[in-house]
Amino acid sequence: MARLSRERYAQLYGPTTGDRIRLADTDLLVEITEDRCGGPGLAGDEAVFGGGKVLRESMGQGRVTRAEGAPDTVITGAVIIDYWGIIKANIGIRDGRIVAIGKAGNPNIMSGIHPDLVVGPSTEIIGGNGRIVTAGAIDCHVHLICPQVIAEALSSGITTIIGGGTGPAEGSKSTTVTPGGWHLARMLEALDSWPVNIALLGKGNTVNPDALWEQLRGGASGFKLHEDWGKSPAAIDACLTVADAAGVQVALHSDTLNEMGFVEDTLAAIAGRSIHTYHTEGAGGGHAPDIITVAAHPNVLPSSTNPTRPHTVNALDEHLDMLMVCHHLNPRIPDDLAFAESRIRPSTIAAEDLLHDIGAISMIGSDSQAMGRVGEVVMRTWQTAHVMKQRRGALEGDPSGRYSADNNRARRYVAKYTICPAVAHGLDHEVGSVEVGKLADLVLWEPAFFGVRPHAVVKGGAIAWAAMGDANASIPTPQPVLPRPMFGASPAVAAATSVHFVAAQSIEAGLADQIAVDRRLVPVADVRAVGKADMPLNDAQPRIEVDPDTFTVRIDGEVWEQQPATELPMAQRYFLF
């Protein structure tokens, strides 16, 4: 009996169980733990499309009709990297949702075919062989300052946006808030034609509960409390009281100046209630110098933003200028300069690296155009993982050695921009992972470009964005190959394949009949019982201490020394600028 070498098998069908894949130009490797497509010993029985290949009439393609259950699309032979594991499988999509993860083909001539992956004449094929698939990324911290940020987000693999804004207004440039029913309605209408899911945050800075409830009825999915609007303990309590009654999440950017209390006062106002703390880091804002300590608390769902990911030799200089612009400060005013310098602390930026690696900071967002870059959430997450492997070695549970697999680290880091923000904001019943029943928001990557530029972005089952060559060429691949909108990005299709996440009170108030949107309005799940323990693979609660004079950080009693990176992967090797 003829046998295939592993190398030849990978060339024909893609890697299989036991094979390791390098992620872009990082030091990170992942190993396939299961192959649901076939694998060695079953070679020739895999679903592969092309001339002379398997998925042809009366061969790998059967006669089953769509009415009889054939999937609309099958992604063949993809390596799935998700929080729950790293496997190879075919992915079936029907009506914009994932219906099966297993083996696809024609059960009349092939063994082990999943009943929901029977390929028929109505089935389209996306070739995933030799490619990686991840869940569409969720950016949990987006300032909607201009519509172009959405194109940039899609180009990097983001399919869900949590945040707020109304355009280039001063409030939006600073605070991630869409305030009030009129602005919420207009933004939901404006975003209806983009192939991304949207969850807008209303303004939480008030002690008037009526002002909060009207925003929930008007389309907000939750609230944002920001220091630039005045973050008093009373406002925190009032906002969380309404959130508890409504079941929605509150995102908090706390008080850098400590005007209205210190971190202990903010924690007292939160009073053990679930809260998503933005900028649980060393530079983005919040109580100086010790906001990072909130990551130790069981009710706090901490995130940080990508401009400090990872700690590099350029971080300090870059942030000072960014802060001056984003928060309307004047470098010629001593008080403004002191504010900026107190907010940017190399020691806490460095500690942020470690807290991500041990799973104490659970999420990463962009803070787009407000000190962060919307197109770099995925990339900077994996740069951080690379730097931490270089510095700390293998993560607990991963084998040691230069060429050993980093599956546990990969699963932890991919969760930071997929399932963790979905759970935190009550979206995980629809998005956040590659699992049956969820929207088919999927990103395909060539391994050499993993985390840098997607091969294709599938939104609700339709290809919305892809790396595409010259449209006047004779084939799709001639240069320049650029991320470009596809048919799935047309307004009608985008509305059919994407959702607006809103509070349940919006649905009850009949919002869908009051605004000009074509997509579904989906209520967020009740998140008020969600705590740190619910953050998959990112639930650590170490003891964190910050010296108020030197800003030295101790994590479980150990000082974390600053070692800013001088060189990163996924950088100039891929980009001119």
Swiss-Prot record:
Q: In which pathway does it act?
A: Nitrogen metabolism; urea degradation; CO(2) and NH(3) from urea (urease route): step 1/1
The cross-references to Gene3D superfamilies, in alphabetical order and at most eight, read: Metal-dependent hydrolases, Urease, subunit C, domain 1
Q: How does it assemble?
A: Heterotrimer of UreA (gamma), UreB (beta) and UreC (alpha) subunits. Three heterotrimers associate to form the active enzyme.
**Which species?**
Mycobacterium ulcerans (strain Agy99)
Which HAMAP family does the record match to this protein? Urease_alpha (MF_01953)
Q: Any idea which residues are catalytic in this one?
A: 327
EC number in record: 3.5.1.5
| Tree of life domain | Bacteria
Entry PTM: Carboxylation allows a single lysine to coordinate two nickel ions.
Q: Which gene encodes it?
A: ureC
Q: Which residues carry this modification: N6-carboxylysine?
A: 224
Binding positions for Ni(2+) 2? 224, 253, 279
Protein name, entry field: Urease subunit alpha
